Amino acid sequence: MGKVRALRARVHRAAVRPDGDSAPGPVPRAVEPALPQSPAGGAGAKDWTFVHNDIFARTQIDPSALVQRLELDQRSVVSLKRGAEPKAILPKKEKLKLRRERWLQKIEAIKLAEQKLREERKRKAMVVVGDLHPLRDALPELQELEAGRQRQQARRRVTSKPRPVELSRMTTVQRQQLLEEERTRFQKLLASPTYRASPLLAIGQQLAHQMQLEGGKQL
C-alpha cells in the first residue's frame, strides 16, 4: 500500500504594500481540492495530488518588455572579436587551391633566403682585385731570395764541422749535400763550351781540378 502524504495548501502570499495603503479586502484562501480516495486493498496504488492549474492568473507582464533589440554598443567583447560577418564556406577545391598557394609562398621564401645566404658567402670568399703594384713592391725579388739562401748555406758550411771524405762516415745530411754539389757541378760542366767542343777533355780537367781540391783539403 502506498504512503499517505499530507496535503499542503499552496497559496500565493499577499503583495507587500506601502504604509497608508489599505488592503482592498481580505485575501481569499484557496480552496483545497478534494483528494480522490484510493481503492482499498489495491496493490501498488498511488496517491495523486492535483495542483491548481491557474498559478499565473495574477501575474502582469508588460508586452513591451518582451521586445528586445541588440544594439552595436551593447555587444559583448567575444562577438566583437569574432566579427560581424560570418565566414564564407568554401568548397573543397577552393580550400586545396588556397593551401597550395600558401605552400608555394613558403617554398619561395625559403629559396630566397638560401639564395641570399649563398650570395653573401660568395661575397665573403671573393678576393678584391685591385692595383697589385704596391703588393709587388712590398714583396722581395726572386734574386734577393736566392742570394739570401746562398748566404745562409755558406754560413752553415762555415760553422758546421768539416765533412769527412769517406761516405761511410758521412751523415745523411752530409750525403745529401754532397749529392747536391755533384749535381750542380755536373750541370755546369754540361753547359760549358769546353764540354761541347771536347767532352772527354772537359771531364778530365774537371776530375783533375776536383782531385786537387780534395788533396788540398786533406793536407
Swiss-Prot record:
The keyword Phosphoprotein applies. One of its GO terms (cellular component) is 90S preribosome. Residues 1-15 have a biased composition (Basic residues). It is found in: Nucleus, Nucleolus. Residues 1-43 are annotated as: Disordered. Its main location: nucleus. It holds the Pfam family SLX9. GO terms for biological process: maturation of SSU-rRNA from tricistronic rRNA transcript (SSU-rRNA, 5.8S rRNA, LSU-rRNA). Keywords: Nucleus, Phosphoprotein. The modification Phosphoserine is found at residues 38, 192. The keyword Nucleus applies. May be involved in ribosome biogenesis. Belongs to the SLX9 family. This is Ribosome biogenesis protein SLX9 homolog. It comes from Mus musculus (Mouse). The gene is Slx9.
